[in-house]
Structures are given as structure tokens and as C-alpha cells.
Amino acid sequence: MIDALYILIVALVIYKTAQFVHRKSLEKKHHCQPVKQIPLVSILSGLGFDMFFKDTAEMTKNGGLHKKLQQMLESLQTTTFRSRMLTGSQIVTMEPENERTMCSSAHMKDWTIGYRPFALKPLLGDGIFSSEGESWKHSRIMLRPIFAKEHIKQITAMEPYMLLLIEIIKSSSANEGPVDLQPLFHAFTIDYASDFLFGESCDVLKENLGGKSTSGMDAQVKRDFASVFNDVQNYLTKRMMLGPLAFLVSSKDFHDGIKKQHEFVSYFVQKAISMSDEELNDESKNYVFLYQLAKQTKDAKVLQDELLSILLAGRNTTASLLSFLFFELSHHENVWTTLKEVVDQSFPDVESITFETIQNCDYLRWCLFESLRVNPSVPFNSRTANKDTILPRGGGEDCSHPILVKKGDQVLFPLYASNRQEKYFGRKPEEFIPERWRDLPKTGGPAFMPFSTGPRMCLGQQFALIEASYVTIRLVQTFSKLKSHSLEYAPKRLVAATIRLIDGCFVSFE
């Protein structure tokens, strides 16, 4: 027994010594410099307990984690720092070059998406956002053609939902005064996303007007799906924060919500896999995402996992973008006036709104990009080191030297802080100024990554931008004036899977 323990201790010492020598060799080879460290104020902070619980509280209750990280970077006068978390060591960096390195195809083997698969698996299974390696590659190959440009061009399918949205806004404005656009944008995006994905809408907007669903699906199943959508996402956000302790987030409400999500999607999946190839081809003429996917596989679980993954991403990011865009427009009358003039000239009627005319409207793109810069829909990106590796910047007093990232370290990239760097985005980076994009590259430059970058970059990027553009154009076409009814300008942001306005987006149109 003693001999075995002695051998184990010796082996551990040898392993740790070899690891130390290897890391020192890496640091010397790449001229690495140390990263600034969050000062330890207690035993708890040394173990990571205080940072972990403070971060969780900030994210799930106060919505201030994005600001907290920015303030920490500013107070340390750095672009990168290291801290202890309950789940291990964490590096926070707002260096765009580090983000691009982590996400590049050349370094994919150096990094994993951490505990994300474990956290998201109850809802998304092995879908594209919760898988890695060969499983992820297969998902990517299968889904990429469905997001081809010619399919995104079919934007006229949005108009029926746009008419419902406009009717609700007009009705609410006439009867109740200010209207909260945030839940309406979430209703619009889930209606359109479900139509695009399944060929049938959730009909949330229609029910908002007192109408009834005309589809073959049980109306209560639709209502259940839409009503628990946000609750399930909030649970998943907490699971991602907890990392290896994600199993602690488990309740009857959570599992009931998952069941309702799966039940909704299963209805459409079973309908698709029961079709013959000839029937699928016939149904695909109107372009339904599910039917395109079912041509490649009839595996019910694969279809369900991928559909829920796309729905989760597509609905939230676009609704968040629209909510914050109109919040900013309602507080910047000069921007609304300019956008109104541009839209009236470029899009005289509904028929003039095409994929090509949207792509050619620079000022509209500036407004969308500026909203994504100031209020990124997904405020964080992260990776976990799969082995000892190097990031190109963040070390030393001037943060210009490479840094060593140890195996198991989590690297967090806060877009909220990165997007507020004057050296990349010009003067007054805290302010909403669409005109700044006149002097920036058309794609935003290497520091602008609202949809991530590299092989895992969002497949639905163009789809989301076209959808947000269409909604914006139609509302600007319909109304001449926009006025804010928010009590204060600085938006209070709630960070979950995406960011939301804590106090909503209360406006009035004329």
C-alpha cells in the first residue's frame, strides 16, 4: 500500500515537472509575457468561489456582467486578465486577434467549446450548436447548402407576418398609447422562423389579435411551445454558467419545458419523415427548411436536434437586434429622420424590397451594424483550451505580447467591451453613431464579429440581417415618426442566451 502510494507521488511529481518544463519552453519559444491577474482578496477568491457566484448573479439577475467585465478591464488598464473561477482558470480578453485565433480552422484542434454540449444537450441533443468534432462537421455540411443565398432571397414570405405586426402596433397605439416592441419582435421572429423551418407558423401574432391558428396542429401545443421558449433558454443559460455543475439546474418546470419544445418539433418531423421522396420534392417548391433537410436524412433525432438549434439561434438574435435598434432609433431623432429619407427614396413600395436592394442600402446597413456593435445580440464568446497553447496578444504591460493558455483554461471574449475600443471603431465608441461606418470596412473590419468568426461562424448571418432589414424598412415605410417612452436612455440589458432590454422598448409611432 505504502509502495503504491510512493510510486503514485513520484509519478505525479515527474508529470508536474515535465508539464512545467514544457510550458516554460512554450513561453520562451513564443516570447510570451504574463497576463495581469485579478487580485486575490480572500481564500474564497483563491478558490474561485467569489467570482463564480458574483458572475452568475450579475448575468442572471442584474444584467450587468458585460459592464462589469468592461470596468475590470479598464480598472486594470489592460485588454486581457486572468481570474479564478469555481470551474477552473479563466482568461478574459478583448483582443480581436485572440478571438480570431481561437476560432480559426488552423487552431480548431487546440480548442473546444467547453461544457456547452453538456449544458445544452437536454434541449438541443447533438445539434450543430452543441456538438464538436465529426458530429459538428456533419451538421455543418448538411446545413450549409440550406442557407444558400438563393434561398435567403425569398423574403416575400415575411410580408403576412409584417402586416400582422403593423396591425398590432396601430391597434395598440390607438387604444393604449405606447407599445412595447420587444415582445412583438419576439413574436414576429418565432412566427416567421417556424414558418421558414416547419412550413407552419406558431401564430403568436395572430393570437395576439384575437385570431385562431388555421394549421392542423393542436393550438395548445403551439401556445405551450411559445410560452415556455424563454423560460427554457434561461435555464440553459444558468447551465452554461455552471459548467461541470450544470446538472444542478434541474427542475420539473425545466423538464416540462423541454418536453413541450420536443413535442412541438416532433409533430413536424414525423410529418416530414412519413413523406415519400416525391412528396418531399413537391413540398419543397415553397422552400421549407425541414423538407430540404429531410431529403438528406430521415433520422428523427437528427432532424429534431438541428431544427431546435436553428430556431433557438435564429429567433433570439434577430429579435434582440430589432429591439435594441428601435430603442436606439427612438432616442436618436436625427438617425430616424435620415433613415426615413433613405428608405423613402430607396424603397418606394413593398415590391421594391428585394435581397439586392437591401444589400445596396448602405445607411440601413450602418444602422444595423452600429446596433450590433453597441448592443451585441450575443455579448460573449468562449473557448476552452484542449492543450497548452498560445494566443498572440494580451501579455506584458502594453498587452502586445503573446500569452500562454494552459490546458483546461477557459477564454472569454466579451464583445460588449471589445466593440467599445476607440482604436478599432473611432471616436466616442460608447455612442450610437451609424455614420462612423462610412469610414470603416464594409464588413466592419477584423474587430467586428457579431456572428463570431471562423468555421463555427453563424450560418444564418445573412438570413438574420435580411430579416431585420425587411422589418426595419417596412416599419419606416409605414410610420413617419418614432418617439421613445423609456424613462431613461441608457438601456438596461439582461444577459441570457442573448441580451434583452430589462425595461422593454416602449415607443409610439405616428
Curated annotation (Swiss-Prot):
Kindly give the Gene3D superfamilies that the UniProt entry links to this protein. Answer: Cytochrome P450
* Keywords for the protein's UniProt record, in alphabetical order: Heme, Iron, Membrane, Metal-binding, Monooxygenase, Oxidoreductase
What's a Gene Ontology MF term here? iron ion binding
Where is this protein found?
Membrane
Query: SUPFAM superfamilies from the xrefs?
Result: Cytochrome P450 (SSF48264)
Which enzyme type, at the first EC level? Answer: oxidoreductase
Would you name any one GO CC term? membrane
What are the EC numbers? Answer: 1.14.14.-
Q: What induces it?
A: By various alkanes.
> InterPro entries annotated for this entry?
Cyt_P450, Cyt_P450_CS, Cyt_P450_E_CYP52_ascomycetes, Cyt_P450_E_CYP52_fungi, Cyt_P450_E_grp-II, Cyt_P450_sf
Answer whether the UniProt record assigns the keyword Heme to this protein: yes
Task: Tell me which PANTHER family the record gives.
Answer: P450, PUTATIVE (EUROFUNG)-RELATED
What's the name of the protein? Cytochrome P450 52C2
Q: Which organism is it from?
A: Candida maltosa (Yeast)
* Lineage summary: Eukaryota, Fungi, Dikarya, Ascomycota, Saccharomycotina
